[in-house]
From Swiss-Prot:
Species this protein is from: Escherichia coli O6:H1 (strain CFT073 / ATCC 700928 / UPEC)
Record-level Gene Ontology MF annotations: holo-[acyl-carrier-protein] synthase activity; magnesium ion binding
Metal-binding recorded as keyword: yes
Family matches, as Pfam families: ACPS (PF01648)
InterPro entries: 4-PPantetheinyl_Trfase_dom (IPR008278), 4-PPantetheinyl_Trfase_dom_sf (IPR037143), ACPS (IPR002582), Ppantetheine-prot_Trfase_dom (IPR004568)
Protein name stated in the entry: Holo-[acyl-carrier-protein] synthase
Catalytic reactions of this protein: apo-[ACP] + CoA = holo-[ACP] + adenosine 3',5'-bisphosphate + H(+)
Gene3D superfamilies: 4'-phosphopantetheinyl transferase domain (3.90.470.20)
Protein's GO biological process: fatty acid biosynthetic process
Keyword Cell membrane appears in the UniProt entry: no
Length: 126
């Protein structure tokens, strides 16, 4: 396997909180997949949940080398946890098509958060 891309992102949690205070659920609706949205609505720390997912999706877009444009959208990247709790990434729509075109066979996700920040790194392999 070869590394195709590496992306990292850091998010200030207070910034996400401010956007939610200003615009309500709009950011969450734009960023989250349908499955993530259902979790977010009842999550005990919804701002932190959204900040972490935002960081992963930005990192993934950077790893793919595209950013969020040309048909790619945040909600086409879905963060979920495997049976051991490890964060994983599932792709939909144009993101899935791009991964198939690039020959992506594996994606690695690491995610961390502290009081003020959430950060993520995504590595994609062919």
């Amino acid at each position: 396997m070869a590394i195709l891309g590496l992306g990292t992102d850091i998010v200030e949690i207070a910034r996400i909180e401010a956007v939610i205070a200003r615009s309500g659920e709009r950011l969450a609706r734009r960023v989250l997949s349908d499955n993530e949205w259902e979790i977010w609505k009842t999550h005990h720390q919804p701002v932190r949940f959204l900040a972490k997912r935002f960081a992963v999706k930005e990192a993934a877009a950077k790893a793919f080398g595209t950013g969020i444009r040309n048909g790619l959208a945040f909600n086409q990247f879905e963060v979920f946890n495997d049976e051991l709790g490890k964060p994983r990434l599932r792709l939909w729509g144009e993101a899935l098509k791009l991964a198939e075109k690039l020959g992506v066979v594996n994606m690695h996700v690491t995610l961390a958060d502290e009081r003020h920040y959430a950060c993520a790194t995504v590595i994609i392999e062919s």
